Curated annotation (Swiss-Prot):
Major localisation: plastid
Pfam families for this protein: Proton_antipo_M
Protein name, entry field: NAD(P)H-quinone oxidoreductase subunit 5, chloroplastic
Any GO BP: ATP synthesis coupled electron transport
Role played: NDH shuttles electrons from NAD(P)H:plastoquinone, via FMN and iron-sulfur (Fe-S) centers, to quinones in the photosynthetic chain and possibly in a chloroplast respiratory chain. The immediate electron acceptor for the enzyme in this species is believed to be plastoquinone. Couples the redox reaction to proton translocation, and thus conserves the redox energy in a proton gradient.
Enzyme Commission code: 7.1.1.-
Natural source organism: Pisum sativum
Amino acid sequence: SVAKSAQFPLHVWLPDAMEGPTPISALIHAATMVAAGIFLVARLLPLFIVIPSIMTGIALIGIITVVLGATLAIAQKDIKKNLAYSTMSQLGYMMLALGMGSYRAALFHLITHAYSKALLFLGS
């Protein structure tokens, strides 16, 4: 889940996926690839809620990913890499919401992020 949704320790593949054509980048970053990890954690959330240390770990990974993604997005000159790191930061917010136990907020953010980021990629 951490690798699939480009969270903190395993986030290095995300900007390199921007080398392809724009419609493929929009599909990867908005709908399918990065959403799968968040959706997996959301589906397994009833199991994770039982153990508070797992929830704390999920929230901590989310916080680190938010800060790292936003910082790396500020430093980019390429618009596609900027959007990739922005996606990483937004996925960190979703992971943080799941770590705090807010299933609905995380899935709402996932759906709205998919639409807005797909339009941003197609417009870049």
